Amino acid sequence: IMQPADFDITAYTALDDTAAYEKAGITTEQWNAKQAAAWYADGGDSETPSAYAWQGNNCWTLDALTAAREQGYDTVIADASFDADQTEAVHTGTYVVHTPAGDVTVLKEQSTLGTLAKGQATSTDAQAESSDAGRLARLIAQSAFYQMEQPYTSRYLLMTFSRTTEASWIDQVMSAFEQASWLNLTDLKTMAKADPYNVSDSVNPDKADDANTANTRSALRQLADSRHDIMRMATSILRNEIDSDEVSSLDPQALARQDANDTASHSNDPTQWIGSL
């Protein structure tokens, strides 16, 4: 499972303005690993899987990793921007970073595979990668090249799809990978337990995008304004209380269900349901 509502932890720390989030009605308790597990349990599953914090629109910095660890995430997913130092040969994408809140395991995506998996060409000159078929062929060929590069070395390479990737494309890629005899498909938990490529108390990300931070601040302002209007409606426009003997006449659905008596015993404070919006 991942952080609730795909909360952007990287933007949260880049903005560094907790008050702005709270004004918009967003608290840290809403996106921690405990809340993610609670939401998963609501679906009826008794066993809770591992929780992973996925990268948002900004890079994973030491502050962002610390915030993720404080919120209960000891493993995060990163794109190729996590380590600005690119090597010629591919390597296991597992890193361990010591943060003030504890160690965080970072699973970094392999850049070329990730680019192709997201439906993008590796360069503007790669005309053969202008179609799904071309990108899929390059993806399989690239994975074979990595195997030939170091045939006797076990490496864990991470590849992710984008949030908007179509299911049909995912099915094509995974079907092709399943038929590739040189590949061994595994899970995030196995990769997280692999010997890390690097262990340190710092990170070397690409430069953060200031535009993303500005967009976050603008979105929070809009949320705060909307929340203010909704709460004003709850306190100034809606009635604070309805007498229980009025409920049956005001709620025809209760009469149809023949549970008007039960409905009458419910709290009729509109701020309760307003607060859940």
Regions from the PLM with identified roles:
Residues 92-101:
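Short acidic-hydrophobic surface loop/beta-edge motif
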Residues 28-46, 58-82, 100-277:
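Catalytic grooves of carbohydrate-active enzymes
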